Amino acid sequence: MNENGAMTLKFHLKEVKEGKRRFENVFQSAARMILENSAMIEKVVVNGRSTYDFKIFRIGQKHVIGMFDEINSFVSCVKDAAEGGSSREMAFVLVGEPGNGKTFFVDSLCSLYRQFLSHESNRRYTFNFKNLERVGTYGKIKTIQSQTFEDPMILAMNLSSSKDESKAYLSEHGGFSDNEIDKFYESYRPLGACSDYIMNDIRNVCNNNIDEILECFEVVPVPLSESMGTITGKYSAKDKITSSAVDLLGEESIQRLLHLTDPNNPYRFDLRRGALARVAGGGIHFSDEIFKNKKDLVQVYLGVIQNRNIEIDGFRWPIDTMIIATSNNSEFNRFLAEKEEAPIVDRCRICYVAHNTDYRMQEYLTNYAIGSETKTTLSKESLHRDPNLNYSASIAVVLTRLPRAEKLTSIEMMKLAAGEVAGEKSIKTLAEVIDILNHEPDITRRFGQKGLGQRDLGRALQMLMETSETNEGQCMFAEDIFKALERVLLDYVTEAGDRAKYFEDIKVARGLYRERIMTEMFNAYMDEPHAIKKDVMHYVNMIIGIDAENLGPDKMWKYKDPQTGQLKALKIDERYIQSVEERLGLKTNDQRESFRTSIRKIYGQKISIDPDYDFMDNIELVKAVTDVRLKSDIAGAGSLIGALANRTNDENQKLYDRMINTMLNKLGYCRTCAQKTIEYFCTRNDEN
């Protein structure tokens, strides 16, 4: 024992009374971890609906991306369980396609929970039985730790065989009021079978003398070990032959039987041989692919989920555990088809996990797939990444995840899902489409439930890096990712209907890549990284200023730039405005005025929230401005494409060299991807 008695039950009670230690179940701890800091909860709009973003899940270098609905469902479930609701008798099961982040989310949650419990004020404590040589029936075993990491407060509530005596002890030695004691007893659990058995032995040896009984205990922190599976532990489904209930519950220990005088002592069961006991003291048990387990293990889970008990040969050990599981769609559907297994599903809070459908957020996930380490070729030379690679890969995989809908095209759906402008289509239209799709009884037909997952993206990137073109050119060229994704479709997507849809989606992604390259080429031609952005904003400011009252005969309009706050002058060029609108297919005055009104409306809504908003998400407008500037304003061999394709004269060669130089020094290209991008631009491939 420490000199200050820090390992005694009395000291622990004193710390709980002073608020330095806590007595709470796993759901209360998890709810406090997520909800304690209100500044870490933000209201956001996702797919046209208001929801909450819990910032604790966005902490760390490699944190959870998106999953707003899934996280909200989980937090709601935990909060309900913490408040004594029905969720405390359920498991939270994430069901979805492979590679959509289910396991990553649970692993992140477990990591956050371990970090949370590592703080002194949040530590979990348990107790050891000691001086067992006095009892005499435990052989050479002198110290035994609570097998299920029971809380010292549970020990205090079971200190005497009489509940009233235990309450009197808490009042006298802990200094707790009657209300506080009643609050503790709302979370009352009996001691586990072996702890209760040992406790009775100690009571008999000590003649029920409380002071003597207390000398046989010491309070210790629960070890926070990821590798040992304490506090957070994972059980992955195994094949039918090697798996057994022992993996979850534990089994009889021959070594212990050699020491124990009484063969009926429940301590003969080594519970820590199983995964559940190691997380029984306020921990999280993660069952990966729960419905892949054979039937007897599923029945074990049914008992554990419902009763929160480990049960062997009639002996019971109450546990304080949050059970989270995952399953892929096919295994879950197969399991549902077996009607006799319905009770376990009835005890689960099923959460269907969709793929990420926000291409802006997908760019973070694509970075995860590419990796943070510096890439090298097979000959150990530095491997450059095309600045358009992330965008190309992200839009391609996101488009495969978007279902077909009559009200929206796939591009409109993608833009709206990312919170961007999609012509005249509003976010409400997307919300309506999602609502209709989410009423489908077939889960895979719901919004975002089917498509290329993160693992498929990883495979495509691996295929890209292993090609001779990538290694010889020392660059991961963006256009090549489409070929790699098509290879993944042929090799890994077995259903013909899905494969045909995904090929169409990748074709659409190629078209978007083409438009991106048009913009990049214009920026390179103008020797300015944001040239097209400036021209787009010129058009927007011109159509706002064209009806201004203070517009003089010289067509000069002065306005305050919302980004810098400075006063700027702009000459209204009606020819330029008309050219852009012709490219947009606006032929009548009514059509033009309607489009201008929509742009002004967007400007008013967006600029007030984000002064840096630049309309670059409006694909049609950006494309029209790019076309006007590239195909109308540029002299030379008829167009920029002609000039770059025909470099037989000095002027065209100088233009080519200047653009290559700009791409190398200002736009983040290497010589390989700069040359390949210009070559692709000149071929007119993937033009809509």
Model regions and ranges:
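Conserved ASCE/P-loop NTPase catalytic core
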Residues: 1, 7-688
